[in-house]
Amino acid sequence: ACIIYTSGTTGNPKGVMLSHGGILSNCEGAQEILKSLIKKDPAVFLTWLPLSHSYEHTVQYVQILLGAKVFYAESLEKLLPNVAIAKPTIMTAVPRFYQNLYSKIFINFSKQKGFKKKLIESTIMLGTKNLDKKKLNFKEKIINFFCEILVRRKIKNQFGGKLKAFVSGGGALDQKIGEFLNSIGLPTLQ
């Protein structure tokens, strides 16, 4: 077993035991899913959580299993410039990171007017429909094609252009946030 120190977010600071069986089970499940996503591409992780964090501790084993190249962000403030350098295929973080990302994107989207606003609304609506495995009609397919080029591709490029998945762990991700990020072209797993 491994004992990880926690800061006591929900109480007093304490050591928490993670069993080797639990760690391996998490790693095997993650490896299977991530290998299917990255296929033959090299696994490139950009990480910023402290290495002592229980989620990051497990992620390190997954990185080894995948033979991944790992970049460590200099700081949260330098995350976007570090993304541009690393061009990650996988980014792992806790739900709070994705909540903050959602808020920033949502605020930016809400400032848009006219055609841009309509395009963003279509991107979210059609992306959600795709996520729910609902068929798009011919008109929706054409609109979705333009949403992919004009909105989703630009968003993906903000994260290095090679991102296959955000992986949220260490707590529950709000379903609404996961659906939103997926709908705008940022594949998000939990």
Q: Where are the predicted features?
A:
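Generic beta-strand/beta-sheet core signal
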Residues: 3, 16-19, 48, 73, ...
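Conserved AMP-binding/adenylate-forming
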Residues: 91, 147-190
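Conserved AMP-binding/adenylation subdomain of ANL enzymes
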Residues: 24-44, 51-152, 162, 187
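Short polybasic/polar patches that bind polyanions
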Residues: 12, 32, 64, 157, ...
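Short glycine-/small-residue-rich flexible loop motifs, especially phosphate/cofactor-binding loops
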Residues: 4, 60, 80, 178-179
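Conserved AMP-binding A3 loop
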Residues: 1-27
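Conserved S/T- and glycine-rich ATP-binding loop of Class I adenylate-forming
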Residues: 6-9, 45, 50, 91, ...
